Amino acid sequence: LHGWPGSVVEFLHIIEKLTHPEKFGGNIEDAFDVIVPSLPGFGFSDRPSKPIGPRKMAAIFNKLMIENLEYKNYLAQGGDLGATIANWIGYDHSKSCKAIHINCLTMRHPHGPQNKEEEEWQKRFDKDQIMQDGYRTQQATKPQTLSYGMMDSPVGIAAWIIEKMYSWSDLKDGDIESAYSKDTLLANIMVYIVSKTFNTASWIYYGRREEGGRFFPNDFKKIEIPT
């Protein structure tokens, strides 16, 4: 599961390695069925009529796997907001999902830092967000205002996305091509432009805010499946 401003493009290089490991020196017995969907409102998936958040998307993907594709169980992997969705899958749908793999810690229970080390991390995080949080505030509160300007501007969409990729990546000497090829960057951007989903993709932040943001419900329920 991808996030924002990601797409299925970020998984293209690994799909065949998982579905046909024997082609890469592995064993065919280790092969997986791999389902790589665009999130609702992103890319070539259907667009919701109003903003929905990661928890609702988790329910949609669980239905996709169990009812539509008729798997008895599955594993979920996600990064960025895809990790948020995977968390909710593990939280709400553990009867079907047997494990989740996340590469971004996007969810937590509504209790503050537990020790001095965590308090120091929280201070660093809060300071960083002063410079990094503008896009999220805009997309979580007034996404349509932004969208009216972006939908007619491929350059605007490219700039909005590239700035995030640059800021969030571990680059060598500030060179974005040390982490991504131009083809990969442009392919990801074109998914948003060609499918005309910059607007509905940005809604996920509005939906997440309405669902409670970064916090699980204050009921002390845990994700019990392997994580």
Where are each of the predicted segments found?
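Acidic, glycine-rich loop-and-strand cores that form catalytic or ligand-binding grooves
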Residues: 192
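P-loop NTPase catalytic cores that bind/hydrolyze ATP
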Residues: 154-157, 182-186
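Catalytic cores of eukaryotic secretory-pathway lumenal/extracellular enzymes that build
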Residues: 1-151, 156-158, 163-169, 177, ...
